[in-house]
Amino acid sequence: MAEPGFLSLTLIGALVFGYFLGSIPFGLILTRLAGLGDVRSIGSGNIGATNVLRTGNKKLAAATLIFDMLKGTVAVLVASRYGPDAAIGAGFGAFIGHLFPVWIGFKGGKGVATYLGVLIGLAWPGALVFAAVWIVTALLTRYSSLAALIASIVVPIALYSRGYPAIAVLFAIMTVIVIFKHKANITRLLNGTESKIGAKG
């Protein structure tokens, strides 16, 4: 049986590892490499895939989405070698790293793609629920933010009902953070001024 001190060090190490992996700003890196400048200067100013899509480059937006998801999935899978607690810690660290990346002044994305990536690594059935809810909501409304909010609210409930109580608690916490990070989007949704999927500028 592992000593409590070892468990604490492992969890701290997993959190730190996850944070630095999650803090890689792929949206910013990819748009600059493509010669599109600073993605933070357009649309919502966010470094995530939805804002990258506003450059008009769908392939770049897809690449951003995949890499931001992989940050969460890879963090979980690597840390899982040291136990489920380490996997959860690394996943949460990656999520926080994406939101508050040290490399760009702690001003990152809104965490949705990395949230999904962590979900894939910890409980992939929950990722199917997220994807289904997101797709249906996005098709009906054309609002990426609304789709993400509804999907992230459904996920913890689905996880708990499917027998993942510890992971459900983690995602309940992450969902609260996602909602907080979308407060400006929520205001725009209520005012009818939120940008729809595919809109430029």
Swiss-Prot record:
- This one is known as Glycerol-3-phosphate acyltransferase
Protein's pathway? Lipid metabolism; phospholipid metabolism
Q: What is its EC number?
A: 2.3.1.275
Signal peptide per UniProt = none
Q: What does this protein do?
A: Catalyzes the transfer of an acyl group from acyl-phosphate (acyl-PO(4)) to glycerol-3-phosphate (G3P) to form lysophosphatidic acid (LPA). This enzyme utilizes acyl-phosphate as fatty acyl donor, but not acyl-CoA or acyl-ACP.
> Subunit info?
Probably interacts with PlsX.
Q: Is rRNA processing included in the keywords of this UniProt record?
A: no
Which taxonomic lineage is given here? Bacteria, Pseudomonadati, Pseudomonadota, Alphaproteobacteria, Hyphomicrobiales
Report if keyword Transferase is assigned: yes
